[in-house]
Amino acid sequence: MAHDTEALEETSVVKFKNQDFRFLRDRCLSRGQLFIDDTFPAEASSIGQKLLMGKRLPKLEWKRPQDLSFGPPHFILEGASRFDIQQGRAGDCWFLAALGSLTQNPQCLQKILMNQSFSYQYAGIFHFRFWQCGQWVEVVIDDRLPVVGNNFCFVHPRRGNQEFWPCLMEKAYAKLLGSYSQLHYGYLPDALVDLTGGVVTRINLHSSPSDLLMVVKTAVQTGSMVACATPKWLTEESEVMENGLVSQHAYTVTGAEKIQYRRGWEEIIRLWNPWGNTEWRGRWGDGSQEWWETHGSRKSQLYENKDDGEFWMSCRDFHENFSCLYICSQFPITMDPGVTPNESWRQMRFKNQVISGNTAGGDGRDIQYLFDVQEPMDGNNVIVAFTVMPQSLKTEEWPFPLQFQVFKVDSQFQKFQKRLPPAFFSQFRDAAQGIDYVTKRNFTKSFHLSPGTYVVVASAHGKEVEFLLRIFLKMPHKDRNPNSSFNLKALKGSLSENESPKSSFHRYMDQGLDIDASQLQSLLNQEYLTGPPGDTFSLDQCQSIMALMDLKVNGRLDREEFARLQSRLIHCQHVFQHIQRSQGVLRSSDLWEVIESTDFLSGVLLSKELLSLMTLRYSDSSGRLSFPSLVCFLIRLETMSKAFRNLSKDGKSIYLTEMEWMKLVMYS
């Protein structure tokens, strides 16, 4: 019986099938050969029977990109984007929708794609990384792709057959799972987890919260992966319906907004179809009456009438036509009323767990995991997430081999540290939750549990199963002020006598002496800022703050730079709380008073025209400013004013070369 795990270490990378990319590449380069992958051969077995039935096998060929491209092939051309992807014959929209979402987080995407090309050290070999049961697995492939004639069997390159990263990544994922057939009709959360190592929150759209728009918008802005699926229609196969949607199909959620329409406001959500075409034909779709009746800068910001698979639709239509929404992030997102996306969670992780094949029924209760719930809380406070190794499963196996129960442990049994005795599992004992069958490779279950000690008991149907178990425990917000919409805690007031701001800062340092933008985002949202969805610091805002405060121009903040930022955050909080019209809301008309009340802006000159432009830049469509937007505005105003004074010789004008100007405006 396990009671806890060690602190989460940096996950090592495992070589799939023991293939070392650098060794294989260097050997091919030294021999002047292009790599041929014998572990995933250019044969029908790599396609799989499910996709070969009735297909023209004699005409199937495997060709390298240089034999298919209309020009020099590229791995990535002008940046990786969801619009580079176009689904082929395999029903792998579940994987491609997840991949499309990942392209919106370039930092995470780069960890999977890595730096590769068709020019530097090209040897016909590529490698990609996927997350499998608590560890990253590196998959090596050759670049031979299945075609009939010169038509791609699976994912198509979009730009003149020149950009090949989606095709090669799809092949690597097919190799990981066994064949291209294993990509044919899968489970969307599996791909979300395999691409990130995150945990998936499933939202039933028929009973979703009223603030779904804000939840989705915040999730997209903070780099979480968001995707959704349509239900089955009349047939078992996916088909295009009259409204333009595809049944049994996965879509990427790429944005959510509120837009002024006629005399009111309309909530709209943006989706992308992995087919690369075939869009919604209803309200707010491309070319719809709603867009014709919408004018101004807001329309130009949001709307493009392109046949690229991306479209807007109203949230009401989204609820009616989609069955479920999935949000994948490093920690769970609960949908309880009043809960913010920056809830604090503690994770217990149990890797490489194996249930032997001879455990079943009552005898299967020898895999046990203890955890404690410390304090009472509203809403779901425990998340149990199982990830089963694909090799433990057979195609379309049912019943699924793994099941689990959660029991509360009485005080008289808490002395047992290694194993609860059979007497604990008497026929009169009720589980905190009935038997849960792990029906998918990635299965997540939420619980609302009272304080006490609990045990997760896993068992199998007489089969050996390898899995990862993660238990997420919600931590109390001891420093939250229940009477305020947000609370940026001044560090000096919350630290003990023996603790300094620098030691608090140490908790967020990545084994060095500074932090990057993503760590800054975590620090601001999880430690200092609590508020409604949408009022948290986005990654883009943190990158902007980072550039403004980064005196050394290295993309990170050191101790002194962070201390400088901290003092401004605390001052911004005081100004915001003093001037706000209502809790958590500042009107753009209050900006003059804000600037006059901000000490670190002393001496800054501002015209009414410039202030009007800043109002357009930093306020929302209803003229309100969130606290993060205000921070970005004030810090940028200070930085640019100081830059002018430092560069000006007469206090009236400055002279810059083109490169000096570009550096100033592009990285600040």
Curated annotation (Swiss-Prot):
Source species, domain of life: Eukaryota
- Which parts of the sequence belong to the EF-hand domain? 537-572, 635-668
Q: Which CDD domains match?
A: CysPc, EFh_PEF_CAPN13_14
Name a single GO cellular component. Answer: cytoplasm
Task: Give the molecular function GO annotations.
Answer: calcium ion binding; calcium-dependent cysteine-type endopeptidase activity
Q: Which InterPro entries match?
A: Calpain_cysteine_protease (IPR022684), Calpain_domain_III (IPR022682), Calpain_III (IPR022683), Calpain_III_sf (IPR036213), CAPN3/13-like_C_EFh (IPR054069), EF-hand-dom_pair (IPR011992), EF_hand_dom (IPR002048), Papain-like_cys_pep_sf (IPR038765)
* An annotated GO BP: proteolysis
Which keywords does UniProt give here? Hydrolase, Protease, Repeat, Thiol protease
Under the heading Pfam families, the entry gives:
Calpain_III (PF01067), CAPN13-like_C_EFh (PF21875), Peptidase_C2 (PF00648)
Which residues are in coiled coils? none
Residue ranges of domain Calpain catalytic in the record: 34-331
Q: What is its EC number?
A: 3.4.22.-
Identify which residues the record assigns to the active site. Answer: C93, H249, N273
Using the UniProt record, name the top-level EC class of this enzyme in a single word.
Answer: hydrolase
Q: Which SUPFAM superfamilies match?
A: Calpain large subunit, middle domain (domain III) (SSF49758), Cysteine proteinases (SSF54001), EF-hand (SSF47473)
Give the family, as the similarity comment puts it: Belongs to the peptidase C2 family.
- Role summary: Probable non-lysosomal thiol-protease.
Recorded protein name is Calpain-13
Organism from which the protein derives: Rattus norvegicus (Rat)
The encoding gene: Capn13
